[in-house]
Amino acid sequence: MQRGLLCCALLLVAAVARGECECLWQGDFSEVQASTSLVLSGTVLRRKGNSIDLSVDRLLRGQEHLDTIRVWLKAADYCRPEPELFPVDSQWVMALHEIEKDVPGGFNPHTPNVSYGRVGDYSLSSCGGYWLKRSGEWVTGNLVQAPRWVREPKMTPVVLDLVTDYVNGKVDKGALLQASREDPALRELMLDTRAFLRGDEEPASP
């Protein structure tokens, strides 16, 4: 009896293990974004199976001619985040890999909405800081020098324009780090003062 229970337990553990992703942490957003095909800011329009349709609100790097792209997420043992993390209408900055070829077993006709993904679509890795949460013009997440595997580290929101400048090589990592550690009240005062003196429209602090 005990031997039978032990065998069942071992089989269950093996089954779970086969469905788990195994990968090393590849780095925060500032470290991993350069190795991806496309970096953009977008809004989730719909979710279907293990994919989301994302509106292309702003391209930070790369080329994409469609207004809406499909991003494939967790299924089987693929090292990707769970679709439930990205509800409809939520806003994100994502560093994405283009799916360039089919993989064996990547498509099951019995579950067409759950698959590896289609050639020409994109996938989002969970092995680093490949996505940042966006609220208006401000982003948070594993952006720069954040603890491994922590998706919502304690930080000051960083303006999207600065992240865009970093992705395009106009500022260095130090600028991101400084912005993520600024005192929010002091920064808001500086923004208000700058807007008053120059008459420019500055993004409202979150």
Locate the predicted segments by residue:
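Intrinsic-disorder/low-complexity, polar/charged segments enriched in Ser/Thr/Lys/Arg/Asp/Glu/Gln
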Residues: 37-39, 68, 91
